[in-house]
């Protein structure tokens, strides 16, 4: 079966990837975070991102990758650089659960942000599964556009919440870096 032979690429918080290999399935685990899955069906490529917070005005460097506004731009530009056309892009959006009852509903804010961002960019959302109170495991085949989600149990959701609330470490400097002062 094709699924068993698929090359799995896991997308963690603050990442995005673009691929054109039909054997690749992208995966991620979401609580209040959101993943946008975009593809160009004619160019035969697609990608996924995974963001923690909706948007912000002036964050740069390593912190910027936590924000949807930054990761949405990176994903779209990554697709365009590899030959996608903006007018052919289509999207699927997942995540945005309310995983902690006492916190503000950042998951809902994430989902609203993603949907509005895509609308503003003229990219149709052909499918979405957002909200609720449980996390999700997402599988996305970027070339075919097929997507599948698996709901997480309460314990799995709480483990995901713990990972989402932990700060993402900044990238480590490369050993051969040269510092000018």
UniProtKB/Swiss-Prot annotation:
Q: Which UniProt keywords apply?
A: Chemotaxis, Hydrolase
Top EC category: hydrolase
Q: Name one GO biological process term.
A: chemotaxis
Q: In the Enzyme Commission scheme, what number(s) does this protein have?
A: 3.5.1.44
Please indicate which superkingdom the organism of origin belongs to. Bacteria
Q: Which PANTHER family does the UniProt record give?
A: CHEMORECEPTOR GLUTAMINE DEAMIDASE CHED-RELATED (PTHR35147:SF2)
Protein's job:
Probably deamidates glutamine residues to glutamate on methyl-accepting chemotaxis receptors (MCPs), playing an important role in chemotaxis.
Q: What is this protein called?
A: Probable chemoreceptor glutamine deamidase CheD
**Name of the encoding gene:** cheD
């Amino acid at each position: 079966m094709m699924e068993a032979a698929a090359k799995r690429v896991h997308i963690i918080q603050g990442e995005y990837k673009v691929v054109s290999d039909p054997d690749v399935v992208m995966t991620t685990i979401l609580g209040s975070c959101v993943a946008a899955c975009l593809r160009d069906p004619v160019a035969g490529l697609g990608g996924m991102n995974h963001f923690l917070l909706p948007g912000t005005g002036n964050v740069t460097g390593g912190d910027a990758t936590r924000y949807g506004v930054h990761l949405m731009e990176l994903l779209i530009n990554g697709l365009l650089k590899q030959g996608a056309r903006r007018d052919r892009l289509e999207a699927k959006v997942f995540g945005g659960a309310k995983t902690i009852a006492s916190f503000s509903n950042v998951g809902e804010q994430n989902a609203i942000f993603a949907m509005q961002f895509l609308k503003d960019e003229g990219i149709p959302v052909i499918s979405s599964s957002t909200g609720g109170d449980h996390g999700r495991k997402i599988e996305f085949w970027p070339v075919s556009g097929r997507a599948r989600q698996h709901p997480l149990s309460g314990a799995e959701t709480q483990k995901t919440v713990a990972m989402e609330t932990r700060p993402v470490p900044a990238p480590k400097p490369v050993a051969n870096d040269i510092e000018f002062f």
